[in-house]
Amino acid sequence: MVSSNCSTEDSFKYTLYGCVFSMVFVLGLIANCVAIYIFTFTLKVRNETTTYMLNLAISDLLFVFTLPFRIYYFVVRNWPFGDVLCKISVTLFYTNMYGSILFLTCISVDRFLAIVHPFRSKTLRTKRNARIVCVAVWITVLAGSTPASFFQSTNRQNNTEQRTCFENFPESTWKTYLSRIVIFIEIVGFFIPLILNVTCSTMVLRTLNKPLTLSRNKLSKKKVLKMIFVHLVIFCFCFVPYNITLILYSLMRTQTWINCSVVTAVRTMYPVTLCIAVSNCCFDPIVYYFTSDTNSELDKKQQVHQNT
């Protein structure tokens, strides 16, 4: 028995996507426009962390701009906008997904350097280096996401004039190309960042438990703990379920797993976890608040210590 003989009923996803994406569009548009305005025009202290957060907000906003087209498609179940916009929308989805993961990881590493190695890292933690890292992140995510759009084109549904987008990759494409792309983006865009986030957060917590460190920096331990907690919760809540499910989905589409119960479970989980992942556009501003508040205080404390 192969997966093609299993039940593939997942039409509930269209209603789910339409509702969730509509909420994400409204909240994400407002939150990220406000964030970009603050980072660009009103923020008095701009450092390397601000650079990462600004790029994260831009990544979110670019994806949010594509949501009205997706919402229309999921409601009407027809893509009238052409192949080019379909490819752009697919590219921006993966660019935002893994760009968000990598920029959040940059923030986590920056926090690790600021707290665990506050003075030795001063030459590394510069706005110039942060810009270089951001360029590298954009190149990496575009290199990983753009190839996926090459295999995405609009197709007619059952010989009608209605066309599809975002779905229906043939299994031959999954077996030859897409499975390799998934392996690349999962290793570079998810597993390595996940390990870095957990490791950096653990090292920061160990450092904060040293009385000498706390008294020297006079940094509120409570604020840092809140920042780490919020960061890890948002990272794990938004990205872990989807990426684990994506691996299972890839195994299903390449017919590595052919059990019908597994196929049914994965087809049910995939739309749900994708909606959770997309919601990161709304949660990222929470990271901005806790990160900018704590890092600003940390930089001030370090500057005072250097001047004394």
From Swiss-Prot:
Subcellular location: Cell membrane
Topological domains, Cytoplasmic: 44-52, 110-130, 207-224, 290-308
One GO BP annotation of this record: G protein-coupled receptor signaling pathway
Tissue: Induced in activated T-cells.
Pfam families: 7tm_1
Lipidation (S-palmitoyl cysteine): 281
Intrachain S-S bonds: 86-165
Cellular component annotations (GO), alphabetically ordered: plasma membrane
Glycosylation site positions: 5
Function in brief: Binds to oleoyl-L-alpha-lysophosphatidic acid (LPA). Intracellular cAMP is involved in the receptor activation.
Family of the protein in this entry: Belongs to the G-protein coupled receptor 1 family.
Protein's name according to its UniProt entry: Lysophosphatidic acid receptor 6
Organism of provenance: Gallus gallus (Chicken)
